[in-house]
């Protein structure tokens, strides 16, 4: 049995109940999420439909001019399948207006700005619709630091933040999410041709096996290496986990003597 295998029916029920319970506690009945065309946000959309009903879910698609056309098409597949409310807001003018005077901007800076622009739109619609912003980052991304602080990582609650990427794929198959989204190469689509795995220098499946041992089984690096995992891979993962710890906590506040 694969260490990452889950009882998918139980997990689905657990996540749906998590959403219902926490929306009720917060006094909200509606949700808003960014629908990118990737599998993570698609899965969250399906969970929200099951938890709140299709009429209470607003999916916002926010393409930039360099976004892969497949991303928007795949997002629309989800909207059509779930029959949820949706809106498309182009962010090209907003991003280009800012970078007009920043000619030396790197792809990373532009990608982070796009993520934060999308966050800003989601929270504005949260106010407009009296809805909670629901996050779409998985556990693998969160612990590798593969997110933009106060960008795609910003949300009121996140139903998939304890699921590794492997779990995301498995649960998506269980829920019969369109296969095009499951089989495509994971990409934040922040610039043309970008893929997550190429950028990080690892595969999600490899990372999940290592991270499961470190985080769930509390094994040391030495114990993980003793199981035969590649040292460069493990070092890459541990370095990313350590370097991104600040993203996983609230801002540090200096305490003064009184």
Curated annotation (Swiss-Prot):
Binding site for ATP: 34-41, 136, 165, 187
Entry-linked Pfam families: NAD_synthase
GO CC field: cytoplasm
GO biological process, one term: NAD biosynthetic process
Molecular function GO labels: ATP binding; glutaminase activity; metal ion binding; NAD+ synthase (glutamine-hydrolyzing) activity; NAD+ synthase activity
UniProt xrefs under SUPFAM superfamilies: Adenine nucleotide alpha hydrolases-like
PANTHER family: GLUTAMINE-DEPENDENT NAD(+) SYNTHETASE, NH 3 /GLUTAMINE-DEPENDENT NAD + SYNTHETASE
Name of this chain's protein: NH(3)-dependent NAD(+) synthetase
Gene: nadE
């Amino acid at each position: 049995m694969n260490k990452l295998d889950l009882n998918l029916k139980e997990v689905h029920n657990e996540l749906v109940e998590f959403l219902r319970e926490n929306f009720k506690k917060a006094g909200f009945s509606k949700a808003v999420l960014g629908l990118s065309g990737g599998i993570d946000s698609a899965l969250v959309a399906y969970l929200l439909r099951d938890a709140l009903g299709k009429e209470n879910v607003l999916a916002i698609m926010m393409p930039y001019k360099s976004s892969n056309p497949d991303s928007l098409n795949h997002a629309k597949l989800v909207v059509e399948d779930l029959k949820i409310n949706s809106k498309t807001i182009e962010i090209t003018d907003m991003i280009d207006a800012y970078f007009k005077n920043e000619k030396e901007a790197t792809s990373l800076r532009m990608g982070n700005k796009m993520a934060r622009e999308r966050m800003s739109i989601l929270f504005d619609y949260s106010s407009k619709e009296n809805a909670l912003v629901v996050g779409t980052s998985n556990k693998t991304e969160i612990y590798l630091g593969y997110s933009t602080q106060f960008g795609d990582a910003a949300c009121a609650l996140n139903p998939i933040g304890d699921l590794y990427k492997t779990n995301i794929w498995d649960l998506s198959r269980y829920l019969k999410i369109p296969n095009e989204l499951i089989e495509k190469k994971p990409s934040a689509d922040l610039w043309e041709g970008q893929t997550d795995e190429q950028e990080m220098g690892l595969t999600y499946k490899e990372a999940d096996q290592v991270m499961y041992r470190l985080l769930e089984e509390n094994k040391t690096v030495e114990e993980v290496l003793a199981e035969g995992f590649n040292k460069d891979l493990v070092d890459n993962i541990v370095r990313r986990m350590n370097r991104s710890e600040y993203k996983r906590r609230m801002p540090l506040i200096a305490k003064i003597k009184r």
